[in-house]
Structures are given as C-alpha cells and as structure tokens.
Regions:
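Catalytic cores of nucleotide-sugar-dependent glycosyltransferases that transfer UDP/GDP/TDP-activated
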Residues: 1-270
Length: 270
C-alpha cells in the first residue's frame, strides 16, 4: 500500500539450482514463521517482493508456485498490477492449498494499511465481509491444487471447506489434487547417513538399533518389546491432533506403549 520498506535479495547455488532469498530483518528476523500480529503486512510484503524482483534478476518464470495463504497475494497482485506489463506477459501461477482452515482472513483495515488493492477490485478478496487472501488466490491463479485427489474433493464440500466451497465449486475446472510424496532417494533408510543404523527390506536389524538410540536420546525406557509411535506434524486439528488427544491418554494408561510427537502449532495441542 502506501508503506515503503527495505527489500534485499540474496542468492545461493546448490545442487545445480539457484535459490533466492528475500531479506528484511524487520519482517522476518523472528523466532517463528507465523502467528505474529503483523502477519498480513509481512506476507503482503513478501508476495509483492517476489514479483518485483523478477526483472532485477532477469528471470521470466513459466510458472510461479504459491503455497497457502502466506503467498496467496502473488496471483492477486500479478492479475491486478503486473499481467499487463510487457515484461511480465504470460506468467502462469499455481496455488496449492495445504490446509484450507488457514485462509489469511482479516478486517478491511489491512487493505488500506498494507495490502493495497484498489477499492474497485476488492471484490476479488471479499468473503463474508472480510478480506480473504486465499479466496483471492483461488479466483486469480491459473490453476489450484491440493495435496491429494481426495482432499481436492473434500474441500468442495461445505463440511470441510471452511466456507470456501462455493468459490471452489465455481472454479472446479482449475482444481486438482496431486498426492504428496517424499524423495525416495534422500529418505532411503538403506543409504541415509543421518540414521543411527541403516537398514533395508532384506535386513531390518538396523531399525531396532534406530529405535533403541531414539529411546536413549529421549530418556525413554529402552525396550525392544514396547511399540514406539512417532508423529512429526503441525499440531493442529486438521492433522488429526483432536483424535490423538482423545486416544492418547487412554492408550498411555491401558497399553504398554511409547509416543514421540514433534511439531508446533496451536497452543492447546502444544
């Protein structure tokens, strides 16, 4: 909007790929990525910086891939402010929804303060009387994806959409689900150097050693006969933490089990 802030740009080359980093310590030198009072301003700045930096690095991307509400303003800004400029012609955008519960929903005062959408175009972001960044991305992105085909179907249902089902059903033609996966080379237990012991489908003995090492590191009783359940995730209801909380106490009291949960998120689960 009307504010001006320093924006630095750093780059690094690793594994034949160039990475660029937006620099502004006022916005980004924080202990955590999200959950700050000025998140709307921080991510509006970041989204605008992504588009502004492209001519400076002389890079014309075929596609800009945006993830969740934190970069939802990128396709909105491109549509309103950049798509008509010759240098920016024909850049496509893909917006991926990882968790539809978090939509970047704010009062309209943030538009005047930092988002900066003209009054004549605010309908792009309007939902239930508020500014909704994810809604704007769904409307303006070239394509919208989710982390699985089943999730793409779920979020078109009012029960799972957190209010965005009408928008998604209206634009169902550009919505698809692409199943999340892992890099099977990096996360290969037979070769992964970060494991305490390597193992494979033909020799599983190393897995028991990894379990024992984890028990030792976390000061758990080192027993091979006790199931050790691990969960690394965002600690939010969307990831099933409400179900975990319901069952965890009963299992801990009635079964001989060990649980290791790693993550951050909602205070009630932390």
């Amino acid at each position: 909007a009307w504010r001006h802030q320093y924006c630095g740009l750093f780059w690094a080359r690793w594994n034949d790929c160039t990475y660029y980093f937006i620099d502004n310590e006022y916005y980004f030198k924080r202990g955590t990525l999200y959950g700050h009072y000025d998140d709307a301003e921080r991510f509006a700045f970041f989204s605008r910086a992504i588009l502004e930096m492209l001519p400076y690095i002389d890079f014309h991307p075929d596609i800009i891939h945006c993830n969740d509400w934190q970069t939802a303003l990128v396709p909105v800004y491109y549509y309103l402010f950049y798509s008509h400029r010759p240098w920016y012609y024909n850049i496509k955008s893909l917006f991926t929804i990882h968790n539809i519960q978090y939509q970047g929903e704010y009062g309209w005062e943030v538009n005047t303060e930092c988002v900066g959408i003209p009054a004549s175009e605010t309908k792009i972001l309007e939902m239930n009387g508020k500014l909704n960044m994810m809604k704007g991305a769904i409307e303006t992105a070239t394509r919208v994806s989710t982390v699985s085909p089943s999730y793409a179907a779920e979020i078109r249902d009012p029960w799972f959409s957190w209010g965005l089902h009408d928008e998604l059903n209206l634009r169902h033609y550009k919505l698809c689900g692409i199943k999340n996966g892992i890099d099977t080379e990096s996360y290969n237990p037979e070769t992964d150097y970060q494991l305490y012991r390597n193992y494979s489908k033909d020799d599983m003995s190393g897995k028991g050693e990894c379990k024992r090492a984890l028990q030792e590191r976390l000061c758990l009783e080192q027993r091979w006969d006790v199931p050790l359940v691990g969960m690394v995730t965002r600690l939010v209801a969307h990831k099933g933490l409400d179900l975990v909380r319901m069952g965890l106490e009963e299992l801990m009291n009635t079964e001989n089990m060990q649980f290791v949960i790693l993550g951050s998120g909602d205070k009630e689960y932390e």
